[in-house]
């Protein structure tokens, strides 16, 4: 997916009034590390109204989630699945939106938001996790790309 498609997902989430914090590859970009990313990683406020807003934006963008034999593609079904507190990858016509929740090493929405700063990501002003939180999440994940990201984050910080 192109950054223009990611831009549109972010615009729609902001326009809907959804509360979220950007993490992952796009957060790295906001912190001076440029690299390709295949998805938008966000942590969302877990209250039912916010989950409904996120689900509505995803479904309006052609969003669906495959869960075994079931294909979830309505705001209600996606919001209900989000309410379970599990991580969810939503494939939309604009790209993949990863809702990160309940993973070890990932702070809660409230914790992330309290340390986040507003930054421009692909031309959209959004809450972006702090460098410290980003570093901690990358260390906790510990995959090869995460270790490279840590090195690049340190280099960008000077």
Predicted regions and their residues:
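Compositionally biased terminal segments of proteins
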Residues: 1-158
């Amino acid at each position: 997916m192109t950054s223009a498609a990611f831009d549109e997902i972010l615009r729609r989430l902001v326009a809907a009034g959804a509360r979220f914090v950007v993490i992952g590859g796009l957060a790295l970009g906001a912190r001076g590390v440029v690299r390709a990313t295949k998805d938008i990683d966000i942590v969302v406020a877990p209250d039912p109204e916010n989950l409904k807003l996120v689900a509505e934006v995803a479904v309006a963008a052609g969003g669906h989630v495959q869960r075994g034999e079931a294909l979830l593609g309505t705001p209600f079904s996606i919001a209900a699945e989000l309410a379970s507190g599990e991580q969810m990858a939503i494939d939309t016509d604009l790209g993949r939106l990863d809702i990160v929740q309940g993973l070890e090493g990932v702070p809660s929405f409230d914790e992330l938001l309290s340390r986040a700063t507003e930054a421009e990501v692909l031309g959209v002003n959004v809450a972006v996790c702090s460098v410290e939180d980003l570093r901690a999440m990358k260390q906790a994940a510990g995959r090869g790309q995460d270790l490279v990201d840590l090195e690049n984050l340190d280099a960008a910080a000077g």
